[in-house]
From Swiss-Prot:
UniProt family annotation: Belongs to the DXR family.
NCBIfam families: Dxr (TIGR00243)
Lineage, top ranks: Bacteria, Pseudomonadati, Pseudomonadota, Gammaproteobacteria, Lysobacterales
Amino acids binding Mn(2+): D154, E156, E225
Pathway it works in: Isoprenoid biosynthesis; isopentenyl diphosphate biosynthesis via DXP pathway; isopentenyl diphosphate from 1-deoxy-D-xylulose 5-phosphate: step 1/6
GO BP terms, alphabetized: isopentenyl diphosphate biosynthetic process, methylerythritol 4-phosphate pathway involved in terpenoid biosynthetic process
UniProt cross-references to HAMAP family, sorted A to Z: DXP_reductoisom
Protein name: 1-deoxy-D-xylulose 5-phosphate reductoisomerase
EC number: 1.1.1.267
Record gene name: dxr
Enzyme class: oxidoreductase
Annotated positions binding NADPH: T14, G15, S16, I17, G40, N128, E130, G209
The keyword Metal-binding appears for this protein: yes
Keywords associated with the record: Isoprene biosynthesis, Manganese, Metal-binding, NADP, Oxidoreductase
UniProt-listed Pfam families: DXP_redisom_C, DXP_reductoisom, DXPR_C
Amino acid sequence: MTKPIRNVAVLGATGSIGAAALDVLARHPRQFHVSLLAAGQRVDALLALCRTYRPDHAVIGDATLYTTLRDGLNAAGLATKAYAGEAALAELVASTTCDTVVAAIVGAAGLHSTLAAARAGKRLLLANKESLVLAGMLLMREASISGAEIIPIDSEHNAIFQCLRSRTTDGVHRVTLTASGGPFRGHNRTMLAKITPTQAMAHPTWSMGPKISVDSATLMNKGLEVIEAHHLFGLPSEQIDVLVHPQSLVHSLVEFIDGSTLAQLSLPDMRTTLAVGLAWPERIGSGVQGLDLMKHNRLDFEHPDTETFSCLRLARDAMQTGGTAPAVLNAANEIAVSAFLQGRIGFLTIPALIEHALTTLPRYEADTLETLLTVDTETRRITHAALTHFPLPL
C-alpha cells in the first residue's frame, strides 16, 4: 500500500542544517512535501528557497521583513502564504500544515516552535540543541504527553539512537560521545588567546554555521551534547563519556552491561542523520557515500583537554548543579560567542564570561517555561554588562 506523503516543516531553512535537510527532501519528492520554510532574517535567501521548493507557508522571524517576504512571494507568482514572528511560526508548526518538523533554528530562538511541535505530537527532528539544554525536562515531558516522536539530528545522539534502535536504555552501561577536537586540538592557552573568529570558524571536518563552529572550537558543543544526551536518553552524567576522535567517522559508541559495544560510523555529513530522522525506521538515500574503510583506515581516540578547553567542564558542572544552571550556561554562551564573532572579546573570554554568569546567578528549579525564560533574559543582561570588564582581544 502506498504510504501518504509526509508534510515537512524546515525551521532554520537558510542555515547549513536546513540546506542539508532540503537536499535530502528533494531526492524523495514522492515521499515528502516541503510544506513550510522558516528563517530568521535572511529574507532573500528564504525567497530563493520558496521559488525552488514552493512551500505552502513561509515564515520570517524578523517581523520588520514581513512586507519584503510577502511582496517577494507575490512577485514570484507563488501561492506561498507569508507570515512573520515567533508566535505565527509556533501556531503553524502545531497545525495540520505539517506532520514532521526539522527544528534547526540556532539558539534559544528555536525554543517556542520546538515546544509547539512537541506539544502537537509531531515527528520532531531535533537539531536545536539549545531547546534541550534550556528546557530539556519540559520538552521531554511535553513529548511524552502528546506522543511526539523526537529523533535527534546531532550526529552523536543520532548514532546512539541508531545503536539503541530507539531511546530505550535498558542494559546500557555507558555511552561515549565523540568530538573532533575542533580546529585547535593540541593548542595551549597562550596560542588560544590569539585566535580570531575566522580561524575559529574553520572546522576541520564539518561544514557548520558560525555559532556552532565556535562552540566546536571551545568544546562547548560537546558540553551541550552531554546535557542533551542526559535528557534524550535519561542517563546520568557518570554514564556519559566524551572522547576526542579527530577523524569524525565514529559518531558515538554504546557499551552494554554484557560487554558488547555498538558504534555508528559514517562520513561526516548531516544528510545522513537527517535521512534517518525523516524515514525512520526505514532507510532512504541521503546522497552521502558509504564509508570506505580501506581509504579511512585510521581511527584515533584521546581524552579531551578540559583544563585548556574549560567549556566542557563548565557544561558538566551546570548539568550536575541542575535546575536553571544549564539555562544560564546556554544564554551566557550565546552572548559570549556573539561578542567573539563581532571581535569584541578574545577566544578565552568565552569560558570566563560563562563562568561569571554561573557563579553570579542563583539556581532555581526549572519547573516552568516562565522561570526558564526569566533566567535566560537575566543571564543575557548580566553577561552583556560583563563584556566591558574583560580584556579586548589581542
